[in-house]
Every structure is written in structure tokens, then in C-alpha cells.
Amino acid sequence: MFFHKKRNVNGFLLLDKPKGMTSNNVLQKVKIIFKAKKAGYIGTLDPLATGILPICFGEATKFSNYLNASDKHYNVIARLGEKTSTSDSDGIIVRKRPILFTPIQLSLALKALTGSVNQIPSMYSAVKYKGIPLYKYARQGINVKRNIRCVFIYKIDLVDQKDNWIELNVHCSKGTYIRTLIEDLGEKLFCGAHVIRLRRLKIGLLSYSKLVKLSFLENLLNEKNVVKINFFKKIDDLLMPVDTPVYFLPKIYISIEKLSVFRLGQKVNFSSSITNGLVRVFEKDNNTFIGLGKINSEKTLIPYRLVSMLTN
């Protein structure tokens, strides 16, 4: 048996969520493997879905909201002619209709679902009502009135469509429900539709090229491997930097002299071409991430969101 006290893990992991697990179940497994004191995930994926599930450890959780607000990219395969209770293949079929649309009608339907779109979250979603996820009400047969959400669909690419299935690539804003999008498409085509496969490919500029599979982590935890390798070094090497969620912000360096004052929450003078904006602040000598600062028009750097000392 492998035992270890909980650690102060700091970093960011791009996990490839497996099918059939909730996002929270995946998080708890990863947290146990890393023996991490603090961890969270960004952007809930349905049990049926796979793909990018960002995991933030320790100090990285302070910046998760920036990545959560980013655009998302999905690949989805849907079955046409059938509407289900959950808008995906996990539910029961509630209605069947013939598939009679033409290529032109499909093109028009996809165009109508592009741009600013109003969606009503599915009852089988993680949206909370009075602190309880909607899917828990749905399982008890309780229907809750949901507020309309306005989302933005930047692009829908038709990958393929044959017989009773269709494959799409979707680029959308935060908060978009792909199941709802597919169900709405089915209604516009007068045949119904539900998701049978969903994979998240990208969040912001972070793509699946750096994904780590849960099965890979579990294999490393195998008792024989734990004995043979420096286990924690191996898994910690998979982590991306703490500032990954704010990678899009400009990067600046401050001297160690100014750093001592800055860490105490005091503003420091800083000459820069950047004005009135957030920046990533690094210590000049060793390239250590300090946190976020805000530069104003008076060439002053003000502490905005700082990290604690990054030690394990």
C-alpha cells in the first residue's frame, strides 16, 4: 500500500477526462493520486463527454476564473431522428421522427444557430437551483423553471452527415450547452436529435496536444512503479506553470528590491508602455511568478492577485 501525507502541490494539469465519469469524480481521483491539499477543475463536462478538463492545484486555483471565461471548442456526433429525456444517449428515447431535411435546410439551420443564441439549460445539467444541481431534481421527477441564457456560437463546421447521424465542430462562448445546441438543431430540422459523443478539444488557446490521461496517472501509481521511480517527481513534471490560466496577459519583471515591497501589498513605481491593464509579475533574477499586478496611467504597479510562496 502507498501512503503519503498531503502535499502543497501548485500547478495546472490538462487532463483528458474519460467517458462515464463525472468531472468531480475525476477531480477526486487526481487529487488522491497527487496527494494534493487543494485542487479544483475548470468547466464541468457531462459524464458522456471526454476531452480537456483543466485541473488547478494550490495557488493555480486563484486564477482559474480567467480560463473558465475563455471560448471552448468541441467535436460532437449526434443521432438524428430521436429525442431523448437527457438530450444525449444516456437518456431514454421520448420521441422518434423521420429524417426528411435537405442539405440546404441543414445549412440554414446551422446558420440560424450561429451568433447570439438563447439557451435553456437541460434539467440534466450541473446548473444549481437553491444550491442543488438540476440533475438531482430531474432524477426525482421534479421540473424546475430555468432562466434563459444568452451564449455566443462563433462557428459551427459540418464535418460529416450520413443517414441518421451528424458530426460537427463547434466554437462557442463560456456557458454554452452542446446538448441543448444539438436538441435545438434537431427541432429546426423537424426530426429531433441527441448527442452520442462529445469531446472538448480546446479551452482558450490550450489544446489537446498536452493532455494527460487518467489511466496514465493510475498506471504510475501502480505499486511496482512507485517503488521503481521517483513517483511525485514524475507526476509533478506533468504540471504546467501556475500562471497558465492567465497566459494571455503581458509579462513583466521587477527587481528583488521592489519585490519585497510589492509582496506586502504596496504599490511600486514601474515604467512601462502598458497602461491601465493587468500584467503577470515575475521576479527578475529567477523568473519566479509572483502574481498579477495592475499598471495605471501614473506608471505605478499595484498588487492585484498574488501567490503565496510556491513550495511543496
Curated annotation (Swiss-Prot):
> SUPFAM superfamilies, per this entry?
Pseudouridine synthase (SSF55120), PUA domain-like (SSF88697)
GO molecular function terms noted in the UniProt entry: RNA binding; tRNA pseudouridine(55) synthase activity
Residues that bind substrate, according to the entry? Y74, Y177, L198
EC code: 5.4.99.25
Q: Which domain of life is it from?
A: Bacteria
GO biological process assignments: mRNA pseudouridine synthesis; tRNA pseudouridine synthesis
The active-site annotation reads D46
Which key words tag this protein in UniProt? Isomerase, tRNA processing
Positions of disulphide bridges: none
Recorded catalytic activity of this chain's protein:
uridine(55) in tRNA = pseudouridine(55) in tRNA
InterPro entries named in the record: PsdUridine_synth_cat_dom_sf, PsdUridine_synth_N, PUA-like_sf, PUA_sf, tRNA_psdUridine_synth_TruB, tRNA_sdUridine_synth_fam1_C, TruB_C
Instruction: Tell me the NCBIfam families matching this sequence.
Output: TruB (TIGR00431)
Please give the function described in this protein's UniProt entry: Responsible for synthesis of pseudouridine from uracil-55 in the psi GC loop of transfer RNAs.
Q: Which family does it belong to?
A: Belongs to the pseudouridine synthase TruB family. Type 1 subfamily.
What this protein is called in its record is tRNA pseudouridine synthase B
